[in-house]
Amino acid sequence: ALNAPVLQEAKAYERHIDIKWIPQSKEDIKYYRIYRSFDGVTYQPVAIRRPWMNRYTDFLGEVGKKAYYKVTAVDYALNESNDSQTVSATTYPMTDEQLLDMVQEANFRYYWEGAEPNSGLARENIPGRNDMIATGASGFGIMAIVAGIERGFITREEGVQRFLKITSFLEKADKFHGAVSHFIDGTTGKTVAFFGPKDNGGDLVETSFLFQGLLTARQYFDQENDKEKQIRRSIDSLWKNVEWSWYKQFKDSPYLYWHWSPDQAWVINHKLIGW
């Protein structure tokens, strides 16, 4: 039998409520079913969530509206677990500052909770491709995690553990004269030529976005303990090994070039100009 989900919180904003539960083993779960009540007595199903999801956002469209929630797990034979415990929250008028906090925390959660689990980096949001990471977006996510630590959304130690995972993965991932590809398989570290066979090597734009985030993290983790020293050493090694001058293609070129392929060289031949 499936265990009842454990609800962690219901958090209200001006016109919607977020609920969150502890994820369970996914093998036997087809989906989670969310129930809502406005009186705490009569509940109606309002949504389902796939087993890899552990949040639901309920848009009520009103200020001052209280709602109660329960969640169940449903298996592939459509057997349903017992109800979770009940959580409730009430929407309220938000200040501009509270609105900005809400947006910032949601942005952080996208990268923190939605990361590819083996690498800790940002997934490319393509249906059916749960293990493909986007390196440029990962740079944005790295900055979001640093902000999340500073804002208290997670602890510094939680952030440190994530960055040890990220840097360890990147050290082993495919690189092309130090640069990374646009897409990487999060389970193997191998390049994914998603845009076609010519796009199977270094991508200097995505590399730049990634390293902007990494260098931000390198400066942020400045404590003199073994873990933060390791993060700094790893990031130093990664960025110092990027051969930016290689991507000029020609010695006297005034331009950098976007792509380089290990078997087709400069076949795309795209100059980085006009920016």
Tell me what each language-model feature is.
Residues 94-95, 139-154, 169, 209-224:
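Well-ordered alpha-helical scaffold segments within catalytic/enzyme domains
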Residues 31-64, 76-83:
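Recognizes extended acidic, P/S/T-rich segments that occur
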Residues 131-139, 143-200:
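Membrane helical hairpin/interfacial module
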Residues 1-28, 63, 75-94:
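Pro/Thr/Ser/Gly-rich low-complexity, intrinsically disordered linker/stalk tracts
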Residues 92-133, 177-179, 183-184:
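Low-complexity, Ser/Thr/Pro/Gly-enriched N-terminal "stalk/linker" regions
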Residues 99-111, 154-171, 217, 223-245:
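Extended, well-ordered alpha-helical scaffold segments
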Residues 97-102, 177-208, 223-275:
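Extended ligand-binding clefts on enzyme/binding-domain cores
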